[in-house]
Structure formats: structure tokens, C-alpha cells
């Protein structure tokens, strides 16, 4: 649909006139019969072809495929059909059928976990492992009632299952975030945590069934964050940047502190930083932060104050970011206020004619080929001369004040009143319009704003012509 053309031409003569008030129409609702005949187009979803599972660049990659028999660690006895890890030893024993290993051999750390699934089950904590065998080099003597031995075995199994689930979740999260991360330090931590659990089993820690339920619940919560403070040059992630602290302090795996010490050894939970972000790991500075970061409100897994570790491990300042954001927004608001929708106004300095006795704004036309063509817009001045004649001068309304017409009014100059607000004269133009015929008289038309101005100008020209 084309735009509506202007009904009235806007010029310098009618720019200050008020427009006629137009009545605004109303929209009418089409009837049902009209709507039935109209074609209504509806958007259709484009069929985007997805790449099949059998093709693609990663068709041969089967490392993260969930096995049909269930997820989790394949060598940790998750189900009845699970097979133990082959070739693993617990230090002193050579039995390959033992489902758990302390991974004392650090030459092949990646074989300690086997293959794992991305979406493995998280209910491994609640499963009870039927075998009461403990993975320790020195088996504790079975001196006591059978119920105490069974309770101790269940506690050990739940703690070990919680440790394995935490290791699995941590590896899956960080490998998905960055497949090139270095996983070597986590195996050393796993050995230390496993040795701590075996030490608790040797001490004969026991608890009631209610404490077992609380412990299983606490194992699913993230009480600590396994963070990093030093970014190595050859790997994206590092877990032991401060070696001096590792040698000076023995990191002991402690339980959640309660009122009595008997309950404290059974509420341990293993978590390798479920909530830590990869961007935080990548941006930590070296030497100023602690080796681990912990969540507030819970005691640290390594015997440190959680509040202090949280304050020391926060690499960013919330107040600083808020102040910077507020400053940038205020600067944007100030910039918007300074900018205005109005275009810059062009200031025109009019050239004054001090000795003129008559001045009037006009538009000058000249006749060529039986039609009038515009010469320009300016100010008409009538000035007396030394020869008792009157000078007619028209200067353009520009900063330069170019001369559009500069002639003397001779006695025989034709001067007539024509139209509504026009005065017609015939003269030899100066400056000349045609360089080839500079002395040829040309009909000039002077248009003023109102008819009264035209009458006044015509009267003055007739008076000065007769002088």
C-alpha cells in the first residue's frame, strides 16, 4: 500500500499557517462472511534434519554410553552381575576378586575407576553390599557380637559408596566441562580418603540404624567444594597448588561435628566440589587463596574453619562488581539525557544594509522560455545613491550574503503589480543571467509574503522611478 501524498505543499510562505483539523476515522470489524473468503496464512516449522546416531565425526566414540545393565562404576559391585576390577591389588593381598582397592600403585591411576557412565544412578549410597569383606591390608579381629560386626561393615560400605559416588560425579562434571583436564590429583586424594575410612573401620566405629540414615542423607549433600588455587601451565585444572601447605599440614578426613564423639565418626560425606564452576577454577590467582573452598554453615572436611576458607577462596568482590555496574548504568543515563532528538540549528547571520530606507524579505524569479524560474530567497533593499537614483539590491539569506540582483531603478523601467503578492519589473540583471547576452533585458518577478507588502513595494518603486 503506497503512502498518502501531501495534500498541501509546504513552503517558506505558508510554514507558519495552521493545518486544517482532520477527523480520525474508526476501524470496522469485518463480518464472518468476509473472513471466510480471506486466506489466513499460518507459520510452519521448518523440518531440520538431525544427524543420525550412526554417523558423524564421533560415531566411533563409545566412552560415555550408558551400559544396558545399569550405570555407575563397573568394578564396584553395583549389581548381582557386576564383575570386579581386574588386576587391582590392595597392597598385601593378591586376590583379584576383591571388589575394592586402595590403589596403592600410582603408576596406573586411571585403572582405579574403570569405565563410568555420564547418567549413572545416584542411589548407590542406599545399596547394601552383601559382601562384608573390607579392603584393608590388616583385617581387624572379629572379636565381638555378630550385630556389631554387621553394623561396622554397613558403615564402611556406605562411606565407601559415598566416596565413589562423589568421585564419579566430580569426574563426570569436569570432564564434560573440559575434556582436557588433568585427573591425576584426584586419585591421590582418593587413596588418602580410602585409607581414612579403613582406619575408622579398624577403630571399630559403630552407630545405630538412625545414624546410618542421617549419614546416607549427608552423603548426598555437598558440604565442601574441592577447589583449586593454582592454574598450571600445561593443564586447565590443578588440585594441589600449595605444596608447602600439603607437607606442613596433614589433611585428615573428619566427620560432621556433633555433641558426642561417638556420633562424629559416622556422618562423613565425600564430595569433590559439585557446585564449583569451571570459570572460577580458571581465574584463581596463585599463592593468595587456600587449597580448598568450603560451603558456609558446615564444618570443613579438612579441619579448617568454613567461614575463613570461604572468605579466602572468593576470587571476586560482589560489591565491586555492583558499584562498577551502577557506575556504567549512570553514565549511560547521562549520555541519553545529553542526546536530544532535535537537529542542530543553523544560525544564519544576515548581512545588514545600514543605509537602506526600505528592506523586505522576498523570493526572486526570472523569466526564461515563457516560464519563471527561481533565482533565490533573500532580502530586498532600496538604497539612495549620489546621483539621486534608487538602488535595488537583493541579497541572499546566507552567511555570505550573495547578491542576487543589483540594479538602479531607471525612469523607464516597467513595474506592474501582478498576482496576489507579486511585483513584476523588467531590467538588465546584474549579475547577468546569460554570459553570452549580458545586456539583454529580463523580466524579474519579486514575491513578498502578503498582498499589503506587495502593494507597498509597488508604490515605492513607482515613486522612485519618477524621481
UniProtKB/Swiss-Prot annotation:
It holds the Pfam family Ran_BP1. It is a peripheral membrane protein. Keywords: Acetylation, Isopeptide bond, Membrane, mRNA transport, Nuclear pore complex, Nucleus, Phosphoprotein, Protein transport, Repeat, Translocation, Transport, Ubl conjugation. Residues 89-103, 132-151, 226-236 have a biased composition (Polar residues). Sequence repeats lie at residues 76-77, 113-114, 226-227, 272-273, 302-303. It is found in: Nucleus, Nuclear pore complex; Nucleus membrane. The keyword Flavoprotein does not apply. The modification N6-acetyllysine is found at residues 8, 83, 127, 449. GO terms for biological process: mRNA transport; neural tube formation; protein import into nucleus. Residues 313-330 have a biased composition (Low complexity). The keyword Ubl conjugation applies. Residues 144-206 are annotated as: Binding to CDKN1B. GO terms for cellular component: nuclear envelope; nuclear membrane; nuclear pore. SUPFAM superfamilies: PH domain-like (SSF50729). Residues 1-20, 84-103, 129-151, 201-248, 313-348 are annotated as: Disordered. The modification Phosphothreonine is found at residue 247. Component of the nuclear pore complex that has a direct role in nuclear protein import. Actively displaces NLSs from importin-alpha, and facilitates disassembly of the importin-alpha:beta-cargo complex and importin recycling. Interacts with regulatory proteins of cell cycle progression including CDKN1B. This interaction is required for correct intracellular transport and degradation of CDKN1B. Does not interact with TPR. Interacts with Importin alpha-2, Importin beta, Importin beta-2, NUP153, Ran binding protein 7, CDKN1B and itself. PANTHER family: NUCLEAR PORE COMPLEX PROTEIN NUP50, RAN BINDING PROTEIN. This is Nuclear pore complex protein Nup50. It comes from Rattus norvegicus. The gene is Nup50.
Amino acid at each position: 500500500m503506497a503512502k498518502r501524498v501531501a495534500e498541501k505543499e509546504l513552503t517558506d510562505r505558508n510554514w507558519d499557517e495552521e493545518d486544517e483539523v482532520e477527523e480520525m476515522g474508526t476501524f470496522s470489524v469485518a463480518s464472518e462472511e468476509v473472513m471466510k473468503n480471506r486466506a489466513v496464512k499460518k507459520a510452519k516449522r521448518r523440518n531440520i534434519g538431525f544427524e543420525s546416531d550412526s554417523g558423524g565425526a564421533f560415531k566411533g566414540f563409545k566412552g560415555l554410553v550408558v551400559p544396558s545393565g545399569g550405570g555407575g562404576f563397573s568394578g564396584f559391585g553395583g549389581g548381582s552381575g557386576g564383575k570386579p576390577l581386574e588386576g587391582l591389588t590392595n597392597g598385601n593381598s593378591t586376590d583379584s576378586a576383591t571388589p575394592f582397592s586402595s590403589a596403592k600403585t600410582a603408576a596406573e591411576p586411571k585403572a582405579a575407576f574403570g569405565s563410568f557412565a555420564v547418567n549413572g544412578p545416584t542411589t548407590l549410597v542406599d545399596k547394601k553390599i552383601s559382601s562384608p569383606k573390607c579392603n584393608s591390608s590388616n583385617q581387624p579381629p572379629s572379636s565381638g557380637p555378630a550385630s556389631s560386626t554387621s553394623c561396622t561393615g554397613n558403615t564402611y560400605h556406605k562411606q565407601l559408596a559415598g566416596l565413589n559416588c562423589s568421585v564419579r560425579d566430580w569426574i563426570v562434571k569436569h570432564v564434560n566441562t573440559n575434556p582436557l583436564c588433568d585427573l591425576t590429583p584426584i586419585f591421590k586424594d582418593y587413596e588418602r580418603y580410602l585409607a581414612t575410612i579403613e582406619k575408622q573401620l579398624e577403630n571399630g566405629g559403630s552407630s545405630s540404624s538412625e545414624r546410618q540414615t542421617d549419614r546416607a542423607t549427608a552423603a548426598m549433600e555437598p558440604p565442601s567444594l574441592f577447589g583449586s588455587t593454582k592454574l598450571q601451565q600445561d593443564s586447565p585444572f590443578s588440585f594441589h597448588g600449595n605444596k608447602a601447605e600439603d607437607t606442613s599440614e596433614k589433611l585428615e578426613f573428619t566427620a560432621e561435628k556433633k555433641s558426642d564423639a561417638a556420633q562424629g565418626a559416622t556422618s562423613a560425606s565425600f564430595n569433590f566440589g559439585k557446585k564449583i564452576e569451571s570459570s572460577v577454577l580458571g581465574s584463581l590467582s596463585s599463592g593468595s587463596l587456600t587449597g580448598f573452598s568450603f560451603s558456609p554453615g558446615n564444618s570443613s572436611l579438612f579441619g579448617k574453619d568454613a567461614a575463613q576458607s570461604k572468605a579466602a577462596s572468593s576470587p571476586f568482590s560482589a560489591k565491586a562488581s555492583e558499584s562498577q555496574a551502577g557506575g556504567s548504568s549512570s553514565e549511560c543515563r547521562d549520555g541519553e539525557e545529553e542526546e536530544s532528538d532535535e537537529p542542530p540549528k543553523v544560525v544564519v547571520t544576515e548581512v545588514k544594509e545600514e543605509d537602506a530606507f526600505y528592506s523586505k524579505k522576498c523570493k526572486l524569479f526570472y523569466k526564461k522560455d515563457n516560464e519563471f524560474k527561481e533565482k533565490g530567497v533573500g532580502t530586498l533593499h532600496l538604497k539612495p545613491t549620489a546621483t539621486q537614483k534608487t538602488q535595488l539590491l537583493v541579497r541572499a539569506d546566507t552567511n555570505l550574503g550573495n547578491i542576487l540582483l543589483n540594479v538602479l531603478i531607471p525612469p523607464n523601467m516597467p513595474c506592474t503589480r501582478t498576482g496576489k503578492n507579486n511585483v513584476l519589473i523588467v531590467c538588465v540583471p546584474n549579475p547577468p543571467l546569460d554570459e553570452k547576452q549580458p545586456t539583454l533585458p529580463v523580466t524579474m518577478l519579486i514575491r513578498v509574503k502578503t498582498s499589503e507588502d506587495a502593494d507597498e513595494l509597488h508604490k515605492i518603486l513607482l515613486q522612485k522611478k519618477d524621481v
